[in-house]
Curated annotation (Swiss-Prot):
It is found in: Secreted. Ca(2+) 1 binds at R263, G265, D295, G297, D300. It comes from Proteus mirabilis. InterPro entries: Hemolysn_Ca-bd, MetalloPept_cat_dom_sf, Pept_M10_metallopeptidase, Pept_M10B, Peptidase_M10B_C, Peptidase_Metallo, RTX_toxin/Mannuronan_C5-epim, Serralysin-like. It catalyses: Preferential cleavage of bonds with hydrophobic residues in P1'. It comes from the Bacteria. This is Serralysin. Belongs to the peptidase M10B family. GO terms for cellular component: extracellular matrix; extracellular space.
């Protein structure tokens, strides 16, 4: 994948030398790469400052037209043989990819119907972006596209995106998660003004990741990279992104401004998604989610409840989550707040952020960190370790299995008079008496609870005999900190 990038007008005979080639040559070094932050990486990917508003006109909204011409003739303008029209599946995924870019930035796309066009006259098409296929056994490129403001030989060659089916048949069968969809999103990125993170194009003795301009040049961070996500410690298990990633969002918003109308309501990402967007939606435990969230408001949720693997779910902007058995495959763009997270069947680690979070562990032995904010934390079944954080936090228990005597939860930082332990659902749904009665010792009656505190270890223990079958508790929570039975419980 790639683009040819013209600094000045050149003859058409030279343009073919600037197109993508299939060979990539690696020349690794021991160079220590600098790290680029979110803004720096975004500006670097957009370093040509080329938009559909003009060269060096950045940060302004744009209206961009596109088309799928019915190509005719033996060549396109770059000397590639047998141009022909996108098929319907390609058109579908091109539209989805365009939507993905406009989702994050102030770009309005309008499709224009275009009829038969000689490939040698592609620059005469009156739309900003044109898509086409090439069947050229002599060509060596997989796909290429031109930036806005690309001129050569007296022609405006801006916004042309060409895809070879001879050297990569997957270009004509794009699906979410495959390389064909990644290729489309990548090439559209070029047509909107994005560069590769380094000054490389396939076929130009590409030096390899270790000679990148900066450490985050990989497909963990940007769809514009040539380098696989594992170069930076991620692992997508053979899947590819189908939408802009973390640094792509930064880059495109630098060029066109942020789309602040995108998803201002209460949105769910993952299982039970209400976004209507394929790359934000999981419906099966085998789905592979790869996305970076841009969201403009509301009370929003990461729902990864349908996955069985151990997961790391991190709601802090700029950080990465390990979701559904993949590593570092989900992130949150800067200036975006996701308030809630739901874990799955594995042993999950969940980090909240500065907002008032609702954090749900689900099944498994989970570790939850509320950080700041006034959080609601529900570990769910399993032996969970719960850190409320600095705010006023509520720890919820709904059933006996949430904290068994043999696998008790541990609340690590309880603050008496500030935090609460909510047993109301547990009492109403489990106790025949519907009442929690604190006692010094169990007497065999249902609904009895004991609460002890060790001043030396600063540890409390809540034990409950829910059913009254004997003198032993069914439910227990270990708590770091003093707990007042009169004020610290919701019953």
């Amino acid at each position: 994948m790639g683009s040819f990038l013209l600094k000045k007008a050149v003859g058409l005979s030279n343009i073919s030398d600037l197109l993508d080639k299939s060979g990539i040559f690696y020349n690794y070094s021991t160079k220590v790469l600098p790290s680029f932050d979110y803004d720096t990486a975004g500006k670097h990917i957009a370093r040509e400052d080329s938009t559909w508003n003009g060269k060096y006109v950045i940060g302004q909204p744009a209206e961009v037209t596109y088309s799928f011409p019915k190509w005719e003739g033996k060549f396109n303008q770059f000397g590639n043989k047998n141009p022909y029209e996108f098929n319907e599946l390609q058109k579908e995924h091109a539209r989805k990819s365009l939507d993905a870019w406009s989702d994050i930035a102030n770009i309005k796309f309008t499709e224009v119907a275009v009829g038969n066009v000689d490939g040698m006259k592609a620059s005469d098409v009156k739309t900003d972006i044109t898509f086409g296929n090439i069947y050229d056994p002599n060509g060596t490129f997989q796909a290429y596209a031109t930036l806005p403001n690309t001129y050569a030989y007296g022609k405006d060659l801006s916004g042309q995106a060409w895809f070879s089916d001879y050297h990569y048949a997957g270009n004509t069968t794009p699906e979410l998660g495959n390389y064909g969809r990644l290729t489309i999103i990548h090439e559209i990125g070029h047509t909107l003004g994005l560069m590769h993170p380094g000054d490389y194009n396939a076929g130009q003795n590409v030096p390899g990741y270790l000679k990148s301009d900066y450490a985050e040049d990989s497909r963990q961070y940007t769809v514009m990279s040539y380098w696989d996500e594992y170069e930076t410690g991620a692992h997508f298990q053979g899947a590819y992104a189908g939408a802009p990633l973390l640094h792509d969002i930064s880059a495109m918003q630098y060029l066109y401004g942020a789309n602040t109308t995108t998803r201002t309501g209460d949105d769910v990402y993952g299982f039970n998604s209400n976004t209507g967007i394929d790359y934000y939606t999981a419906t099966d435990s085998n789905d592979k989610l790869i996305f970076s969230v841009w969201d403009s408001g509301g009370n929003d949720t990461f729902d990864f409840s349908g996955f069985y693997q151990d997961q790391l779910i991190d709601l802090r902007a700029g950080n990465f989550s390990d979701v559904g058995g993949l590593q570092k495959n989900v992130s949150i763009a800067q200036n975006v707040t996701i308030e809630n997270a739901i874990g799955g069947f594995g042993n999950d680690i969940i980090h909240g952020n500065d907002a008032d979070n609702t954090l749900i562990g689900g099944e498994g032995d989970d570790i939850i960190y509320g950080h700041s904010g006034n959080n609601t934390i529900y570990g769910g079944r399993g032996q969970d370790t719960l850190h409320g954080g600095t705010g006023s936090n509520t720890f919820i228990y709904k059933e006996i299995a949430d904290s068994l005597v043999t696998a008790a939860d541990k609340i690590m930082d309880f603050k008496t008079g500030i935090d609460k332990i909510d047993l109301s659902t547990l009492i109403q749904d489990t106790f025949s008496s519907k009442i929690l009665n604190f006692v010094d010792n169990f007497t065999g009656n249902a609904g009895e609870a004991t609460l002890s505190y060790n001043e030396v270890t600063n540890a409390s223990e809540l034990a409950i005999n829910a059913y009254g079958y004997n003198y032993n508790p069914d439910f227990k929570i270990d708590i770091v900190g003093f707990v007042n039975y009169e004020t610290d419980f919701i019953v």
